[in-house]
Amino acid sequence: MFIKGRAPRAPPRERRRATRGGLRQVVAPPRALGSTSRPHFRRASVCRRRCRKSGGLLAASRKMAAAAVNGAAGFSSSGPAATSGAVLQAATGMYEQLKGEWNRKSPNLSKCGEELGRLKLVLLELNFLPTTGTKLTKQQLILARDILEIGAQWSILRKDIPSFERYMAQLKCYYFDYKEQLPESAYMHQLLGLNLLFLLSQNRVAEFHTELERLPAKDIQTNVYIKHPVSLEQYLMEGSYNKVFLAKGNIPAESYTFFIDILLDTIRDEIAGCIEKAYEKILFTEATRILFFNTPKKMTDYAKKRGWVLGPNNYYSFASQQQKPEDTTIPSTELAKQVIEYARQLEMIV
């Protein structure tokens, strides 16, 4: 006899279990007559539990793969501190590889550039540009500074001026803002002097003096790396171009040659422009001396670059570039009339 309503639970002896597709299925007894209940199955819930379990294993395997890519054996739940330590350790290892290649007698510049590119990506994880909201350890700051210093020197060897300017803009933070927290770098004054020479070679005199004001007076007067560009700026203001050319012989470091050559080329162009205006013709040997060339071949190459033609008498002629006589005639009659009229008006005022 059945009672209307929910189907009663079947006795244990009447339950049946079946295994289909490796999943356990529990089947309820037939519903009671007139009952509105439906047989229920546990197959869906079992599937959901197994899916959740397999999904958790998949997520764990993904974490382990990501950790392996980052250089770790597995994943850890110790928090951001452990992650930062792992990144710092990886950056230190990559820096040692870069340093080893850079300190070779003839470093591979392409390989160094690739290492610098990878290191900058790693440094981004460490917030290598300090801000007010970040707290970096002394080890992290020194590591980032050393990498940027190699990058600045690498840019000089590659003759990449924009890259050098970017590296110096980043290094100034470590040289000035953190000078109390960090020990002084052995390359600080050399790179700051290079930056001054760079600004001078680009004729950015205002920025040159702005950077100079950030340095102590003692360094300006005594440090050999800073004194050199300061002396060059004084020679340029005096018009003593011969002293500028002589200064190339006593550069404080080999890296200064790159910007010195740019500065000397600019000065030569200015002198050559004045020669074209002031001389109708000039002797080959005299032009070589005025333009501070030490070999005739360099003078010949520069003359071809300027479009100068050497005549049979060993003279460079600039007659075609001189102003025409009518263009240089002084209107003396008109000037005299204006002066007389001006004097007459002064007498009327008195």
Curated annotation (Swiss-Prot):
Component of the 19S proteasome regulatory particle complex. The 26S proteasome consists of a 20S core particle (CP) and two 19S regulatory subunits (RP). The regulatory particle is made of a lid composed of 9 subunits including PSMD8, a base containing 6 ATPases and few additional components. Interacts with DDI2. Interacts with TASOR. The modification Phosphoserine is found at S106. Pfam families: CSN8_PSD8_EIF3K. The gene is PSMD8. GO terms for cellular component: cytosol; nucleoplasm; nucleus; proteasome accessory complex; proteasome complex; proteasome regulatory particle; proteasome regulatory particle, lid subcomplex. Residues 162-331 form the PCI domain. Belongs to the proteasome subunit S14 family. This is 26S proteasome non-ATPase regulatory subunit 8. There is a cross-link at K297 (Glycyl lysine isopeptide (Lys-Gly) (interchain with G-Cter in SUMO2)). It comes from Homo sapiens. GO terms for biological process: proteasome-mediated ubiquitin-dependent protein catabolic process. Component of the 26S proteasome, a multiprotein complex involved in the ATP-dependent degradation of ubiquitinated proteins. This complex plays a key role in the maintenance of protein homeostasis by removing misfolded or damaged proteins, which could impair cellular functions, and by removing proteins whose functions are no longer required. Therefore, the proteasome participates in numerous cellular processes, including cell cycle progression, apoptosis, or DNA damage repair. The keyword Ubl conjugation applies.
